[in-house]
């Protein structure tokens, strides 16, 4: 019987990168046919790239070919975003004719994101995120990402957990919440003391990393109050499951945007603690 893995290996052999072909060639480690066969989960988290920005032109996803796009107040499909004076549909950021892969940064904080969302009306993305937000890449611009998506599984129309910046979404990723769960359960609205609407807590302050030092320094100070609910690594520690974060506090653009730095269990971790060894030192 031809498995999905066999089919994909043959279908992508000519086009896929060598690293992807090598991965597909490795026999699946199927012993029980259950989740117990999974030994390692590797997650790479990027920022500031929307689903359609990468995969809007990929066949088989609800990208620019979506048959049922969100309607705007004007009655037009959601692609026709306004900058306040004109409509700007999606356009190709062609890396063959420009420095499109670098391009320009766009706003990505809570205020501009909420304004673009506009209570679900979604009509002013180009106004509050700038027209650059409407640019997208194609297969020739990001061939490796397209090869991965076609060789393995892609989650259709995958979006951020919270319509705001990087730190809040990384806090959700590492803990399942951006707002103290106990308060949420009581129906109490969040404040900036117990939630993260904008980038704040996931940076050392001042940015006092020490170049060349192999360990986080005891002099690190952090911005904002500590969060004290459990992170995913805390739960894995309790369950006896191994984990590691490959982000070096002393060699990663000032240690910025490490999602666990918002939490007391990481901010106050001491040398030898699991969260210190596996969460703050970078190496294996």
Across the structure, where does each feature detected by a protein language model lie?
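N-terminal pro-sequences and low-complexity stem/linker regions of secreted or lumenal proteins
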Residues: 2, 6-284
């Amino acid at each position: 019987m031809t498995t999905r893995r066999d089919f994909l290996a043959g279908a992508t052999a000519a086009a896929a990168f060598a690293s992807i072909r090598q991965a597909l060639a490795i026999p699946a480690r199927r012993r029980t046919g259950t989740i117990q066969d999974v030994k390692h989960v590797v997650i790479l988290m990027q920022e500031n790239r929307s689903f359609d920005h990468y995969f809007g032109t990929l066949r088989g996803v609800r990208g620019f070919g979506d048959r049922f796009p969100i309607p705007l107040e004007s009655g037009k499909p959601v692609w026709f975003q306004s900058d306040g004076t004109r409509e700007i549909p999606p356009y190709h950021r062609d890396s063959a004719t420009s420095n499109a892969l670098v391009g320009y940064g766009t706003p990505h904080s809570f205020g501009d994101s909420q304004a673009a969302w506009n209570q679900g009306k979604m009509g002013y993305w180009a106004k509050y995120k700038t027209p650059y937000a409407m640019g997208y890449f194609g297969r020739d611009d990001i061939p490796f990402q397209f090869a991965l998506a076609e060789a393995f599984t892609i989650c259709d129309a995958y979006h951020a957990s919270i319509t705001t910046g990087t730190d809040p979404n990384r806090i959700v990723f590492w803990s399942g919440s951006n707002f103290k769960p106990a308060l949420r359960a009581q129906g109490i609205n969040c404040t900036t003391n117990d939630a993260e609407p904008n980038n704040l807590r996931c940076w050392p302050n001042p940015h006092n990393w020490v170049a060349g030092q192999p360990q986080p320094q005891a002099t690190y100070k952090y911005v904002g109050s500590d969060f004290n609910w459990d992170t995913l690594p805390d739960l894995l520690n309790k369950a006896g499951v191994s984990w590691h974060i490959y982000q070096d506090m002393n060699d990663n653009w000032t240690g910025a945007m490490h999602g666990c730095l918002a939490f007391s269990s990481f901010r106050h971790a001491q040398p030898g603690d699991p969260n210190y060894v596996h969460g703050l030192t970078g190496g294996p």
